[in-house]
Amino acid sequence: MEKHLRLAPSPTGLLHIGTARTALFNWLYARKINGKFLIRIEDTDIVRSKSEYTTNILNGLNWLGLNWDEEPINQSKRVSVHKNYIKRLLESGAAYRCFTSESEILDLREKQKKSGLPPKHDNRHRNLTRKEIKEFISQGKSSVIRFKIDEETEIKWEDQIRGEIKWQGKDLGGDLVLSRRALGDEIGNPLYNLAVVVDDNFMNITHVVRGEDHISNTAKQILIYKALNFKLPIFAHTPLILNSEGKKLSKRDSVTSIDEFKEMGYLPEALANYMAFLGWSIKSPESEILSLSEISKVFNLSDVNKAGAKFNWEKLNWINSQYIKKMELTQLCKFIKKYWEEMGWESPSSEWDLKLTNLIQDSMILLKDAIDQSKPFFILSQMKKEGEEFLESKKEVKESLKYILFYLKEANITKVNKDNAREIINKIIVNHSIKKGILMKSLRVAFFGCLSGPDLIQSWELFSENKIDIPLIERCFN
């Protein structure tokens, strides 16, 4: 039998890092066992579900390289199928109509709260007669459909990550609501637990891999599987992603959507690589920089941790920097030029673009770093305090800069390269007894306004080609 795994997101918001990590684990295991990775959009919440969120989720998965193997299914198009299965449960006696009103439920919960009891339905309408049901309907009362849960029953399964898990029926909050309210003998819109079971069975899902916050849902769903005589899938519950304080990562932790990671300048390969290690570890890793294809060959659900996985920004940044360092120069240049275009910066040539990309590549952590690191080569950089202090620290500082201007003009150099740059530097050192350290620091301050920066000779070439090297040096005398 072909193995099927799935991601079943609700399109009520942007693709979240937690959903993306769940998708990744499903995708990796599907590839490992030569199965299929499927998508089901759980869009039955008419009020909150939006098509633009569906588009965002699918685009985000594509961006991460998580391709799916069949056309995505929309749960909202299968409502009539779900209702038919609810009818089957009603006919078999596994479910019943419950006419308890919202106010009655609130009263019940208030009493339970005062008594220190957890919220739990009292199943008061489980054994209504046909006559009583007709009477409620004639009174215009609406009803939900509830699934009977035997409080004495024990639900257990062998979780692929957590081992054996047991639940007692009495801990599931009373009989489970399968549908929203409806009048007369109608069945309201089916709810999550029923729809999930029916659709997973329809899609021949063999492995359900999802977050640990679904464990209680799994216990309820197993009972529905059995009531409908469906074959149970294998279950695996992944650990939550935690923030630095050990709490569940949420929107309050600023960056959580895949779009935000993309905007910040993370590469999809790097983010996917990092997410794989959020809750999973490889035995005897030769490297932490692995492609999805490489990870899929060694990925196993049994190696996923039970404990929550703390999100580590430093680790993600390091992984991203490694991917930038090994990126082909022309490809990285294309990314960087988009930032230049957004800033309205124009470069002198495509060759110059590649030179600047090569210069800053190894110091970049995020793609967006290209803005700050490229800026001095387009716009006169502001003189920082340490630069101003250095310019006034020794008379040799400004003297060395005057000599640079002199030799540039004497040799009529309009385009600096590494050869004529070194020739000028050597002349100043030999002819004017200026120490090389003073000379190089002076030139760096002129170019960058501070004592740090990328390779000086390569930088000089770029400044010269963009015709701002002389203005940068001359400003030191103003």
From Swiss-Prot:
SUPFAM superfamilies: An anticodon-binding domain of class I aminoacyl-tRNA synthetases, Nucleotidylyl transferase. ATP binds at residue 251. Keywords: Aminoacyl-tRNA synthetase, ATP-binding, Cytoplasm, Ligase, Nucleotide-binding, Protein biosynthesis. A motif ('KMSKS' region) lies at residues 248-252. One of its GO terms (molecular function) is glutamate-tRNA ligase activity. HAMAP family: Glu_tRNA_synth_type1. The lineage of its organism: Bacteria, Bacillati, Cyanobacteriota, Cyanophyceae, Synechococcales. A motif ('HIGH' region) lies at residues 9-19. Belongs to the class-I aminoacyl-tRNA synthetase family. Glutamate--tRNA ligase type 1 subfamily. Monomer. Catalyzes the attachment of glutamate to tRNA(Glu) in a two-step reaction: glutamate is first activated by ATP to form Glu-AMP and then transferred to the acceptor end of tRNA(Glu). Its EC number is 6.1.1.17. This is Glutamate--tRNA ligase. Gene3D superfamilies: 1.10.10.350, Glutamate-tRNA synthetase, class I, anticodon-binding domain 1 (1.10.8.70), Glutamyl-trna Synthetase, Domain 2 (1.10.1160.10), Glutamyl-tRNA Synthetase, Domain 3 (3.90.800.10), HUPs (3.40.50.620).
